[in-house]
Amino acid sequence: MSLLRFAILCIIFVSLFGVHECFRGEKINVPAHPCYHTLCGSMIRNCYCCLGKKFDYCSPNQQNCLFRCEEVNRIPDFPKTNGVSKGLGPPIYLFFLGQFIYFVLGL
């Protein structure tokens, strides 16, 4: 196998890792504690502020912050696809990869 064919094969396998990770869209990295401790000002020394997409929420009580943060920044059960399909499933793209390797690269 020539060096060029090996390099093309490595690029294909590395790019397939990214495609494989796209199929796992339901796994979203959320911090274990979405509320971080900070100093709010002179009146309230200890605050817990929410890390979220929708708005910043701060509370002197950590439990209130956790409850409100999870309520507002809830992750939907079914991720929105905006009308776009997930694409080809893993068995199909592996089939096409095999065909590509066989016919184009001649391996």
Swiss-Prot record:
Keyword set, alphabetical order: Disulfide bond, Membrane, Signal, Transmembrane, Transmembrane helix
Tissue: Expressed in flowers.
Predominant location: membrane
Topological relation to the membrane, as annotated: Single-pass membrane protein
Cell compartment(s), UniProt: Membrane
Entry's transmembrane regions: 87-107
GO cellular component: membrane
Signal peptide location: 1-22
Disulfide bonds: 35-49, 40-69, 47-65, 50-58
Protein family (similarity comment): Belongs to the MEG family.
Name of this protein: EMBRYO SURROUNDING FACTOR 1-like protein 5
Encoding gene (name): ESFL5
